Amino acid sequence: MRTFSVPNTTRQSAEILAALEAHPAFRAATTVLLYHSLKDEVDTHEFIRKWSREKRILLPVVVGDDLELRLYTRPEDLKPGAYGIEEPTGELFTDYADIDFIVVPGVAFDRNGNRLGRGKGYYDRLLPRIPSAYKAGICFPFQLVEKVPAEPFDIRMDEIITQ
């Protein structure tokens, strides 16, 4: 995969997240499932802090082969979890029907809303449990490809937001 310089990805992350926060479905949402980004993903760290003042922000925690969702409270309550990802230690969240909007990470996306993850299937198992939430994939332009292989059971994104 292509790599970009830090200043370039920082600028691109800011532009992508500005488009995300202007999205009508995001603006209307009260409970949002985000992810704490890795170095090669759109940087969500400050975005999480910013919006946690106005919305209920959930983050995934890896537990075995699944993701459980926990309430984000503040940066000091994050701890390194699986794969070096910072994970919240806040309250366990199980009211999936209350989730209005999901920001989904991916290695690649296509314009049809298909997503390629990192191969562990965490989101493949999680997303079917949250069918009514609006699902937005966010990615750098080089992660948007012509076609992502998809199976009939794969959950498509409602929209891909990129620069």
Model-derived regions, located:
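Conserved phosphate- and dinucleotide-binding cores of soluble alpha/beta proteins
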Residues: 68-163
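N-terminal active-site beta-alpha-beta segment that forms phosphate/nucleotide-binding
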Residues: 1-97
